[in-house]
Design a protein with these regions (language model features):
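Intrinsically disordered or low-complexity boundary/linker segments at protein termini
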Residues: 1-49, 58-83, 88-113
Length: 113
């Protein structure tokens, strides 16, 4: 049950997921949410535009924004969050991969660009 959107994580699976950072900015600005961006497959490190957007958010909102590069997602990490925001294409890939952590994810907002 989604009660709050205080703790949100956003996995970035591909370069096309960069638009999700707009949602991160809005949640920080309007709700003072704490955002964790998960860099899957080194997408942020290898994409100049996404990296700049993440760096800008980290500089402007250092207490609200963090970047995580772990490849393994633990149940404890998922339990700390209220919401996951993911693109439709990445959601499809995640479901197709039958990832172990799917059963433990919090509420999900699936967004199409």
């Amino acid at each position: 049950d989604l009660q709050n959107v205080d703790q949100v994580f956003i996995p970035i699976f591909s370069a096309e997921d960069g638009f999700l950072l707009d949602y991160a900015q809005k949640l920080i600005y309007n709700n003072d949410s704490k955002i964790v961006v998960l860099d899957c497959n080194d997408q942020i490190k290898n994409n100049f535009i996404i990296k700049n957007a993440v760096d800008s958010l980290e500089n402007n909102y250092p207490s609200n924004m963090s970047l995580l590069t772990n490849k393994v997602i633990e149940k404890e990490f998922l339990n700390q969050h209220d919401l996951m925001i993911i693109s439709l294409e990445s959601w499809k890939k995640l479901v197709d991969s039958q990832s172990d952590w799917l059963s433990d994810i919090p509420s999900v907002l699936i967004v199409k660009p």
